[in-house]
């Protein structure tokens, strides 16, 4: 029965006695209820379709986002530069078990309350942030990008981000003995407003159905290239002081990984046909810089561990300029790097930290080309 037929029957039965037609009335009401649910579902589906078409229209002609018949097979390679990034990621694979935290507790127990507070909150931020990056990769980027080489990279990045999250969680579990405080740190997004603010900014880009792929790509390049930069620098400051060897070793590995992820985002952006205006990129980057500066100079000031807040603010601007140049834009802040100990740490394009890593950080044989694999009996030994 249609909705109109049901309503007509209801009108006919309106004057009838209740006992005689009560069962029919109940049936009609149930059927009417079902039809209303169906109508609501159809309306919601139509609205969702409209939203999807709006999203698709923004990126409709972007080749990298279009379905490809051969996207399930990697060879023959079509994007050798993207593939090279994937192989670099594989070569740099590491596990939490490789990081020795045995000597850290002596340093931790010698630190004052401010230093312990600062480090624990930085670790809490990192533990949550890697999960947010993965949320974006799983929900959006790896589903949208159809280029096989890029999908390989994203698949491996998800695994690496999981290792980062595990590492930070292990650091918290090792340093923080009080269970209540530990649980508070594991729920940092809900417990600390200054961490929630950064998380909300990143999450907004995941849920924004109207933002173009290019905008979201820039936003997450800012997450990994700006939101992490000051926190990395604060931990490297501890290394300069000869403290926390396990923490600083993991920081070296993770900052190298994130530098690679940031550079990959810039490479992918360079391949997009529909690029953003320089002003739009500036708007996204300025937003991220302001949040990061507030985070490390007001909400969780680095002077708690003996760093200079003004110089940290300058360093964040320097990092932002580096990202802008990689994206093909002019520098916005023109700030110099105030921290000599951060020269070559996944930031300076002249000497990439990935290329300077010690040999044990790289998986053997992964980046070796075919010519180097050949065994020559006439070679000099």
Swiss-Prot record:
GO terms for molecular function: metal ion binding; ribonucleoside-diphosphate reductase activity, thioredoxin disulfide as acceptor. Fe cation 2 binds at residues 161, 224, 258, 261. Residues 49-59 have a biased composition (Acidic residues). Keywords: Deoxyribonucleotide synthesis, Iron, Metal-binding, Oxidoreductase. Provides the precursors necessary for DNA synthesis. Catalyzes the biosynthesis of deoxyribonucleotides from the corresponding ribonucleotides. Belongs to the ribonucleoside diphosphate reductase small chain family. Heterodimer of a large and a small subunit. This is Ribonucleoside-diphosphate reductase small chain. It comes from Caenorhabditis elegans. The lineage of its organism: Eukaryota, Metazoa, Ecdysozoa, Nematoda, Chromadorea. The gene is rnr-2.
């Amino acid at each position: 029965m249609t909705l109109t037929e049901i309503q007509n029957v209801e009108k006919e039965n309106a004057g009838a006695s209740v006992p005689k037609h009560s069962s029919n009335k109940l049936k009609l009401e149930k059927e009417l209820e079902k039809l209303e649910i169906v109508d609501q579902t159809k309306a919601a589906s139509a609205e969702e379709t409209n939203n999807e078409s709006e999203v698709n229209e923004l990126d409709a002609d972007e080749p990298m986002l279009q379905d490809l018949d051969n996207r399930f097979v990697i060879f023959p390679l079509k994007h050798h530069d993207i593939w090279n990034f994937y192989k670099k990621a594989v070569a740099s694979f590491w596990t939490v078990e490789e990081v020795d935290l045995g000597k850290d507790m002596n340093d931790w127990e010698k630190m004052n309350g401010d230093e312990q507070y600062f480090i624990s909150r930085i670790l809490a931020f990192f533990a949550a942030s890697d999960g947010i990056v993965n949320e974006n990769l799983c929900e959006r980027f790896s589903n949208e990008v159809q280029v096989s080489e890029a999908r390989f990279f994203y698949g491996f990045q998800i695994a690496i981000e999981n290792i980062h999250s595990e590492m930070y969680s292990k650091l918290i579990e090792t340093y923080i003995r009080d269970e209540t405080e530990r649980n508070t740190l594991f729920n940092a997004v809900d417990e600390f407003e200054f961490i929630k603010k950064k998380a909300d900014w990143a999450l907004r880009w995941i849920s924004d159905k109207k933002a173009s792929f290019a905008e979201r790509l820039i936003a997450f390049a800012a997450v990994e290239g700006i939101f992490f930069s000051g926190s990395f620098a604060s931990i490297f400051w501890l290394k300069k002081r000869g403290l926390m060897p396990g923490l600083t070793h993991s920081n070296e590995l993770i900052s190298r990984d994130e530098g690679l992820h940031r550079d990959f985002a810039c490479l992918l952006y360079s391949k997009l046909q529909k690029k953003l205006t320089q002003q739009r990129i500036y708007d996204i980057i300025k937003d991220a810089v302001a949040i990061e500066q507030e985070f490390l100079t007001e909400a969780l000031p680095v002077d708690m561990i003996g760093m200079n807040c003004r110089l940290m603010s300058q360093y964040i601007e320097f990092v932002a300029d580096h990202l802008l140049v990689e994206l093909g834009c002019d520098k916005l802040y023109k700030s110099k790097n105030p921290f000599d100990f951060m020269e070559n740490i996944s930031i300076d394009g002249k000497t990439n930290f990935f290329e300077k890593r010690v040999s044990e950080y790289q998986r053997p044989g992964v980046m070796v080309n075919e010519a180097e694999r050949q065994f020559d009996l006439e070679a000099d030994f």
